[in-house]
Every structure is written in structure tokens, then in C-alpha cells.
Design a protein with these regions (language model features):
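N-terminal Rossmann NAD(P)H-binding glycine-rich loop of SDR-like oxidoreductase domains
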Residues: 2-27
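Glycine-rich Rossmann NAD(P)(H)-binding loop
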Residues: 170-175, 203-210, 222-225, 232-235, ...
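Substrate-positioning beta->alpha
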Residues: 170-193, 201
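Glycine/proline-rich active-site loop of Rossmann-fold NAD(P)-dependent oxidoreductases
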Residues: 152-160, 192-203, 226-228, 302
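NAD(P)H-binding glycine-rich loop region in Rossmannoid oxidoreductase-like domains
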Residues: 31-103, 114-116
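Non-catalytic, hydrophobic alpha-helical segments
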Residues: 14, 70, 185, 189, ...
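A hydrophobic C-terminal alpha-helical subdomain
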Residues: 235-305
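Glycine-/Pro-rich loop/turn segments that contact NAD(P) or position catalytic residues
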Residues: 76-163
Length: 305
């Protein structure tokens, strides 16, 4: 029985939901964060915040002592100096795997649908490297792969819309992409953390729709009372960013390269025979439309989605 869990990445969009969900179930949750101020929104008698960084094997090992499960909800796609997919998603997860092994704990690793050694996305390659490290270890683990969090991209579209109410789309915006609600993913991660029968398995979760960025942007525009189409950053501009601005600002360079890949790679999702919601029928299946309505309700007015 899992009664004490350590979560790395517990202050983020996904991690916060998992922390609160597990604590509500009566699980003692230890949140490892490199900045305790970022955990100020996490409060409760079952929630403990400790200082640690997945890039540092010593603090990671210390944070895992005494727990029965370690959950990795980290990602290094964007962040301050030294944060990258290589240092966080590959090396950091390797440290978490070793910490779980040393503590005699089980592991839940958050990964990405499409993770592969030859992926055009650096993040996907590093997630695959972490999965490989799990497979080579003796840790009893569950890997959860998800598609793109729709809340993340809605945030980006809303924040770039400005007074014109025309969100900024990187590239053509015509490539179908599967979007999933982070709430759906959190519900699965919470479940498998406690369900030890899922150990040794890789589970995939996606959303109910494949949408282009143009389609998602137009949904945001419509909810905010507009009718025009989104603005676009041409592919040529994105291609130029990598060898120029990207050298000075690596995060921006990664974002440009990711945008190019998302504009042409197959990012659709079909559950098929491994439909996670057939296995767990009570898992939520939130549509992008419902997520947008929730944003509207949370902010009070459509112009503050």
C-alpha cells in the first residue's frame, strides 16, 4: 500500500493537481522543489515541501528517503539557466530513478506520446532516454505518456492575442495535433501512483480531438467575442531563429525548433486497442471546448479567458 509519496515537479501545472489529489486521498506527499516559494500555493497537513533539484543527485536522493513511491512530473523544456531537456528530463530523471531504487520505492515517470530516440523534438528524445533508464533499472515503475496539454497552449494563445484578439500561431498552424486536458492526465497519474498493478507498464493518454493550432486559436478568438483569424510567425522566421537568437537564448531556440516540428510532424492520437479509458472508465475525458469554458468561468469574463 502506498501511503507516502515524493513528487518532483509538484509545483507545476500537472504536479500541483497530483499533489492535491493524492493528499485529498489521505496520502502523505513530499514535494521536492528548487524554490520553496513556488510551493506557496500547496498547503495542507499531508503536504511537506523540501528543497531539492533533480539535477543534483545528492538532494534528490535525500528527498526520496522514507517514501514508497516517487513521481516524476518534471520537464526541462523551458526554464532558467541550466534547465534543459538533457539536464532535467534525461539526467534529472536518471537521478530520480536511482533515488527511488536506493529508497526501495516504486516510480511513476511522466513521459510523452511519441517519445523516441529519433524524434525531431529534443524533449521527446530525452523523455525516451529516461524511459530507457527505467527499463534498465530494477525499479518497479509505471510510465505515463500523454499528448500536449491543451491548457498550456490556450495560455500561450490568450497571452499573445493582445488588444487585437488575434493569437500568434507559430508556423502554418494547419497540422493536426492531439490535445489533452492536464486534469485528465493528473487523474491518471494519481490513479497509477496508488494502483500497483500498473507497474511494469507504459500507459498512454490523449484527448478526444485532434485540432490544428489555427482551429484552437479560432476557438479562443470566438470565446473572446472576435471573428478574425490568428496571426502567424512564418516558418522561415522560425528556421532563422535557431542558428541566430537560439545561440544566445537556448530556450527560445528550442521553442522555435519545436514549433517547426509541431508544424509538420504527426502529432495525432488514436487510443486503439490500448484505450486507457476503456481500462479505467471513470477517467475524465475533457474536450478543448470544455477547457475553454472552464477558463472563461475561472476568469469571469470572456476577454480574460
Amino acid at each position: 500500500m502506498i501511503s507516502r509519496v515524493m513528487i518532483a515537479g509538484g509545483t507545476g501545472r500537472l504536479g500541483t493537481l497530483v499533489v492535491n489529489g493524492l493528499a485529498a486521498r489521505g496520502v502523505d506527499v513530499r514535494v521536492m522543489t528548487r524554490d520553496p516559494k513556488r510551493a506557496a500555493h500547496l498547503a495542507g497537513e499531508r503536504i511537506e515541501v523540501v528543497l531539492g533539484d533533480v539535477r543534483d543527485p545528492v538532494s534528490t536522493m535525500k528527498s526520496a528517503v522514507g517514501v514508497q513511491a516517487v513521481v516524476s512530473a518534471v520537464h526541462g523544456f523551458a526554464g532558467p539557466g541550466g534547465v534543459s531537456p538533457a539536464t532535467v528530463d534525461r539526467d534529472g530523471n536518471t537521478h530520480l530513478i536511482k533515488a527511488a531504487q536506493e529508497a526501495g520505492a516504486e516510480l511513476v515517470l511522466m513521459s510523452i506520446v511519441g517519445a523516441a530516440p529519433d524524434s525531431p523534438f529534443e524533449l521527446f528524445r530525452m523523455k525516451y532516454a529516461a524511459e530507457t533508464s527505467v527499463a534498465a533499472s530494477t525499479v518497479s515503475a509505471t510510465v505515463v505518456r500523454s499528448t500536449a496539454f491543451v491548457e498550456l497552449w490556450i495560455d500561450l494563445l490568450v497571452n499573445t492575442a493582445g488588444r487585437s484578439n488575434r493569437p500568434l500561431v507559430f508556423g502554418r498552424g494547419q497540422n493536426p495535433i492531439n490535445f489533452v486536458s492536464v486534469h485528465d492526465v493528473a487523474a491518471l497519474v494519481e490513479r497509477v501512483t496508488l494502483d500497483q498493478t500498473t507497474r511494469g507498464q507504459t500507459l498512454e493518454i490523449g484527448g478526444p480531438e485532434n485540432l490544428t493550432f489555427d482551429e484552437l486559436a479560432r476557438m479562443v478568438i470566438a470565446l473572446r467575442g472576435g471573428s478574425d483569424g490568428p496571426r502567424h510567425v512564418p516558418r522561415a522566421a522560425l528556421q532563422a531563429m535557431g542558428p541566430t537568437i537560439g545561440r544566445l537564448l537556448p530556450t527560445l531556440g528550442r521553442q522555435a525548433q519545436a514549433a517547426l516540428a509541431m508544424d509538420q510532424s504527426d502529432m495525432t492520437f488514436s487510443a486503439g486497442v490500448n484505450d486507457i479509458r476503456a481500462r479505467f472508465p471513470d477517467l475524465p475525458c475533457t474536450s478543448p471546448e470544455e477547457t475553454l469554458r472552464n477558463f472563461h468561468a475561472a476568469n469571469g469574463r470572456a476577454d480574460r479567458v
